From Swiss-Prot:
InterPro entries named among the record's database cross-references: Mit_carrier, Mitochondrial_sb/sol_carrier, Mt_carrier_dom_sf, SLC25A33/36-like
Cellular-component GO terms for this entry: mitochondrial inner membrane; mitochondrion
UniProt superkingdom: Eukaryota
Single GO biological process annotation from the record: deoxynucleotide transport
Family: Belongs to the mitochondrial carrier (TC 2.A.29) family.
Gene name in the database record: Rim2
Protein name in UniProt: Mitochondrial carrier protein Rim2
Amino acid sequence: MAQNTADTLIHLIAGGSAGTVGAVVTCPLEVVKTRLQSSTAFMTPSRLAENAGGGPANGGQSELLRPEQRRKLSTTILRNRSQPQVIGGVRRIMAISHCGISSTTPKSMSIVQCLRHIVQNEGPRALFKGLGPNLVGVAPSRAIYFCTYSQTKNTLNSLGFVERDSPLVHIMSAASAGFVSSTATNPIWFVKTRMQLDYNSKVQMTVRQCIERVYAQGGVAAFYKGITASYFGICETMVHFVIYEFIKSKLLEQRNQRHTDTKGSRDFLEFMMAGAVSKTIASCIAYPHEVARTRLREEGNKYNSFWQTLHTVWKEEGRAGLYRGLATQLVRQIPNTAIMMATYEAVVYVLTRRFNNKSNEFYDF
């Protein structure tokens, strides 16, 4: 097998396997993160009291409102200011973000509350909503990303107009990989997000139904809603890989000093930690684009563009709104990245020994 073909196949199998394992294990946290990023993650005081041990306030009826329900509620409040404080079973004190009306600061679900709410109202299977499109998207996304990153990095190093393996090389490689991968797989992630925001507990929407519904609403262009936010998210991948490559180079120096030719559990643990640390820092820096992307993929016409969405969220919900779901993102991202990097390095190590007989080297992206 030709060297280039073997390398491409290694990237494909390793990236797909790593992404798949990480996606399956952390899918429940991914669903919670998407729900918290959404504009529907508000709770009424009665629900908060129930979670605190006060019991159900309205017979156990769900008080998690969709955007259209909050808009309807806000209209009712405006027309009936003299009416009692309980309208349609929901207290007026609840923040109504879609009309910019708030009697108090919006209350958002915690991770545990959101998990409990999903299981109680939609069943345990709802924790894996969107897993199908996620798995379909993971393999090609990782394959495209790592192959593009590797090819761009090799090309830049061979051209010689920038210093080999410098931060600039890593930044340009990550930017190219992020752009190509985001453009190619945005429709898949769009469908996944829509399915995770489906609150129907009785009949879960299938992938085909979701695709048909989105296409009927906006055609092919609808599947690329939020692509601008994804492009802004490329800065996260650049920060991630610059930090990761730096940590990796230091680990390689230490490994060379140990004069060992084979990888052990310590090596894979170090890669897990390097991936988790670099991704955590990158996520904290670039997180608002995730919230904007999720809002743009919601049904409705309130959020139209990337900057308009950021401005609306900032105006109605403040800084907290731009970072809503960050805790869940980090809780999910750390184990996901650790699992993904460990799986990736393990598969690459095994396949590299099998195809290229390079067991005495760290495999270079």
